Amino acid sequence: MPGVKLTTQAYCKMVLHGAKYPHCAVNGLLVAERQRPRKEHPPGAGNHTLFVDCIPLFHGTLALTPMLEVALTLIDSWCKDNSYVIAGYYQANERVKDASPNQVAEKVASRIAEGFSDAALIMVDNAKFTMDCAAPTIHVYEQHENRWRCRDPHHDYCEDWPEAQRISASLLDSRSYETLVDFDNHLDDIRSDWTNPEINKAVLHLC
């Protein structure tokens, strides 16, 4: 599997989703730019999947529900319109010391892998969460022989960790998580935009 990297925008929105609902499990999707298919990837070419954005899905009860199907269909359509592809899934469990993927996480990630072979499953480690974002809070899993296995936990999975750390801390300090919209919020009020353009602007402004 190629390497995995997250842009600052994708990382920050994952962090903000967990911060908005600190006592709940949360989940979401990660999208990458759609690439033209290549017949061959030269060995050692340093190919990697870059997650350019994060789409927060649900908070509270995470299950394989009809609403998840609605979300996947709507977000897949949005991705096609913007030359993106759903390429990953993230989840933060309810319990602070539980950072292992459960059945829901593995099933949704496997569903994504059917359409994107290099899909990644990212688990957010709540035990590492601090307001100053001193260390990355994620564990990256890859699918190998139909099982999800954790990649090197010491690897830097952010495209620019110093930038991601600084901006995440700034957004937490300004309580930007209060304005974050997930798909649950959108279902409550369809005027709520799950692409979170205001947070995207805030990240860009702080870069």
Swiss-Prot record:
Keywords: Endoplasmic reticulum, Membrane. GO terms for molecular function: membrane insertase activity. It is a peripheral membrane protein. It comes from the Eukaryota. Residues 4-147 form the MPN domain. GO terms for cellular component: cytoplasm; EMC complex; Golgi apparatus. Its main location: endoplasmic reticulum. Signal peptide: none annotated. InterPro entries: EMC8/9, MPN. One of its GO terms (biological process) is tail-anchored membrane protein insertion into ER membrane. Component of the ER membrane protein complex (EMC). EMC8 and EMC9 are mutually exclusive subunits of the EMC complex. Part of the endoplasmic reticulum membrane protein complex (EMC) that enables the energy-independent insertion into endoplasmic reticulum membranes of newly synthesized membrane proteins. Preferentially accommodates proteins with transmembrane domains that are weakly hydrophobic or contain destabilizing features such as charged and aromatic residues. Involved in the cotranslational insertion of multi-pass membrane proteins in which stop-transfer membrane-anchor sequences become ER membrane spanning helices. Belongs to the EMC8/EMC9 family. This is ER membrane protein complex subunit 8. It comes from Rattus norvegicus (Rat). The lineage of its organism: Eukaryota, Metazoa, Chordata, Craniata, Vertebrata. The gene is Emc8.
